[in-house]
Amino acid sequence: MDTVRKRGEIISIEQRSLVSQRYRRMTRAVNSEFWGSTSETTHSLYVGSYGRGTAIDTSDIDILVELPRDEYNKYDALRGNGQSRLLQALKNAILQTYPNSDIHGDGQVVVINFSDGIKFEVLPAFRQLDWWGNWNGKYDYPDSNMGGNWLTTNPKSEQQAMKEKMLQAMVCYSTHVSTCVKFVITILGVTIFRES
C-alpha cells in the first residue's frame, strides 16, 4: 500500500484520496448554495495542520470556505446570533451532499464526522476588505459562542510563517550537521595522519 509518512504517523494514499474527494464534494455543495456555481475547487482551501502539510492523521481536516461578502452583511444585520444562523445555513448546504453524516455547528465551524473516522471542520469566511474595497488577505469568520461575534484570520500568512519556521529549522539543522561532518572529517584526518 502506498503511504505518506508524516511525523512518524502514516496517512495512506487511499485516505488522502478520500479526503480530497470529500473536500471537492463539500466545496461544490457550498459553491452551489452560496455562489450559484458547480466548481469543486474555487472558494475553498485546506487550513490547519492538513493545509500546512503537518497532519499526522485524518481525524481533523480543516477547510476554509469563502462565502460572498453579501452573506456577511446579511447575517451581520440579523438580530440575535446571526453567526449561529450562518453555521446552520452552511450545515444545510453540506447536508444536501452528505445527508447521512453526523453534521453539526460547533462555535466557529461546521463539523462533519464520517463513520470511517475522518472528520472535517468547515470554517465559513468572508474576505476582509480595506477602505477602498480591496482584499487585505484576511478573512472574517463567525463565532457563535456567547451571543455571536466576528473574528479575523489570515491563513495564508499563518501557512507562510510555518514554512519560514520550518525552513529556519532546516537551515539550522543543516548548519549543525555540516559542522558535525567537518568535525568528524577533521578527526578522521588527524587519525589517518597520525597512523601514517
Feature-to-residue mapping (PLM):
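Residues that form generic nucleotide/phosphate-binding pockets
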Residues: 6-7, 29, 93, 180, ...
